Regions:
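Glycan-recognition and catalytic cores of secretory/periplasmic carbohydrate-active enzymes
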Residues: 1-302
Length: 302
């Protein structure tokens, strides 16, 4: 974050999703503060947030993803041959939004919330307004943006105090767009049968064409439209976060097709793909779900 704020390139510390882990730490710490105030912890978090705010100011448009900005600045959201499944651009912004909501609830401080709303507005304008098919290649933002929608809907005074361009319904629209655009892609690369390196090269060569996007495969629940999926598939954390987001969205939009889809997936998961311990994700390779009733004693499990 400090390097982004200074406008330098290179030398990112760790993989792209480390941004998200920092935001998740803030979210978790905020929950502690909500139940038990701790001035020392709050001061420490305020220091982190100040550095995040400074980094967010560098782009000038609300975008903040330290890996992409330091290492691949021409590849925002996987454009120009970038690899979004690695970059985690959408995931990280979702984690920021969720952290900001939790931190405001705990402290009523708005610095991180302003950063998050600017990022949310940017991503709405870039994806929804332009009707791009981009979806989170790692779910999590779905639930986070619903939380932002609810926070602003339930606190009109907060909206007024922030003095930002805020229409909370845009964030719910964006989540529906993400959910309903899974499976809507160029039908390639063939992650199920191809070599990963070949698939990545296919993406970097932009063989998906203009005004389209690559598939992220069943690993990222992108093999068919979300609301048509019959079994829970792929990376266990991604899959459970996706359908948690669908549940959150259904509680707001009350669309029957959302309810039907999540009940179907829930039944498949808990009756056929969950260990007696409650763990899911039987296969270590790709940390993913197995077939129905594939529940070995030496399973991976999340």
């Amino acid at each position: 974050f400090d390097r982004v704020a200074r406008g330098v390139l290179g030398n990112h510390a760790g993989p792209p999703w480390y941004d998200g882990l920092i935001y998740e730490m803030i979210r978790g710490a905020a929950d502690f503060l909500h139940h038990k105030p701790d001035p020392e912890l709050e001061d420490r978090l305020d220091g982190y947030i100040k550095r995040i705010e400074k980094a967010a100011g560098y782009s000038g448009d609300g975008y903040l993803n330290t890996w992409t900005q330091l290492m691949e600045p021409d590849h925002r959201f996987g454009f120009n041959g970038g690899f979004l499944r690695w970059q985690h651009d959408v995931y990280n912004i979702g984690a920021m939004v969720e952290a900001a909501v939790h931190y405001w609830k705990a402290t009523k401080k708005t610095k991180l919330l302003v950063v998050a709303i600017n990022a949310a507005n940017y991503i709405y304008d870039m994806i929804f307004k332009e009707n791009l098919k981009i979806v989170p290649s790692h779910s999590g933002p779905e639930e986070a943006f619903v939380k932002l929608y609810k926070l602003l809907k339930e606190n009109p005074g907060l909206k007024k105090d922030l003095q930002l361009d805020i229409d909370e319904y845009r964030y719910l629209q964006l989540v529906e767009h993400w959910i309903e655009n899974r499976g809507n892609h160029a039908n390639g690369p063939d992650w199920e049968n191809g070599d990963d390196e070949e698939c990545i090269e296919w993406i970097k060569n932009e063989k998906y064409g203009n005004n389209n996007r690559p598939s992220w495969g069943s690993y990222a629940q992108d093999h068919k439209p979300t609301l048509e999926q019959e079994t829970i598939e792929g990376h266990a954390v991604r899959a459970t976060l996706l359908f948690a987001g669908v549940v959150k969205t259904y509680r707001e939009n009350k669309k029957p097709k959302y309810e039907k889809a999540v009940k179907r997936i829930w039944d498949n998961m808990v009756t056929k793909r969950m260990h007696i311990s409650g763990g899911v994700g039987a296969i270590h390779q790709d940390e993913k779900f197995g077939e129905d009733y594939h529940l070995p004693n030496n399973a991976y499990l999340e």
